[in-house]
């Protein structure tokens, strides 16, 4: 058991019978010096998010989830199938992937971390950066441009993001999977 004041982003807590991952915490002190902790939480079983407030001394159960490095194998509607080093396969529901599904493509070589709760694969964490091919973007706009010029692009997997003006269709780019931002040309 930990107090609300000891919980950090990335911890998983049990709340109302469900596991919630802490995405953000903010501690403030009231006039009477009692700490109030505001947390942004994401339900690992239902992919819902909420913001809630706790007193600093409130106790909550901090749980440890099993994580396993896996590679993406294939998609069997509505499940994404991942395989570990011993060739064991784990099914993760498409709804549990959220935005990560747009970065999962056939033949991807990056290792993902599959998270388990009570023996069931419930979510997938992508690497911090992935390299993907630009499948469509408009030609560069030459002329009256100064500074950092961005344009929309679609990548393999279907995600749309802003890329630098010099990126062309067919280029490989590096993307930050946490912020969904273009980092550089690969």
UniProtKB/Swiss-Prot annotation:
It comes from the Bacteria. GO terms for cellular component: cytoplasm. Transmembrane segments: none annotated. Its main location: cytoplasm. One of its GO terms (molecular function) is translation elongation factor activity. The keyword Transferase does not apply. Pathway: Protein biosynthesis; polypeptide chain elongation. GO terms for biological process: peptide biosynthetic process. Keywords: Cytoplasm, Elongation factor, Protein biosynthesis. It is found in: Cytoplasm. The keyword Protein biosynthesis applies. Involved in peptide bond synthesis. Stimulates efficient translation and peptide-bond synthesis on native or reconstituted 70S ribosomes in vitro. Probably functions indirectly by altering the affinity of the ribosome for aminoacyl-tRNA, thus increasing their reactivity as acceptors for peptidyl transferase. HAMAP family: EF_P. Belongs to the elongation factor P family. This is Elongation factor P. It comes from Shewanella loihica (strain ATCC BAA-1088 / PV-4). The lineage of its organism: Bacteria, Pseudomonadati, Pseudomonadota, Gammaproteobacteria, Alteromonadales. The gene is efp.
């Amino acid at each position: 058991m930990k107090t609300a004041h000891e919980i950090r982003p990335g911890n998983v807590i049990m709340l109302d019978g469900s596991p919630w991952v802490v995405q953000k915490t903010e501690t403030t002190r009231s006039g009477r010096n009692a700490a109030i902790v505001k947390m942004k939480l994401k339900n690992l079983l239902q992919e819902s998010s909420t913001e809630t407030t706790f007193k600093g001394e409130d106790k909550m159960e901090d749980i440890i989830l099993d994580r396993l490095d896996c590679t993406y194998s294939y998609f069997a509607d509505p499940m994404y199938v991942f395989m570990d080093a011993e060739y064991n396969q784990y099914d993760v529901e498409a709804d549990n992937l959220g935005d990560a599904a747009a970065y999962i493509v056939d033949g991807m070589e990056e290792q993902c971390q599959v998270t388990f709760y009570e023996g069931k694969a419930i979510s997938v964490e992508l690497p911090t950066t992935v390299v993907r091919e630009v499948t469509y973007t408009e030609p560069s706009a030459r002329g009256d441009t100064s500074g950092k010029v961005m344009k929309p692009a679609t990548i393999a997997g279907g995600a749309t993001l802003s890329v630098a003006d010099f990126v062309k269709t067919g280029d490989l780019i590096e993307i930050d999977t946490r912020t969904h931002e273009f980092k550089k040309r690969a």
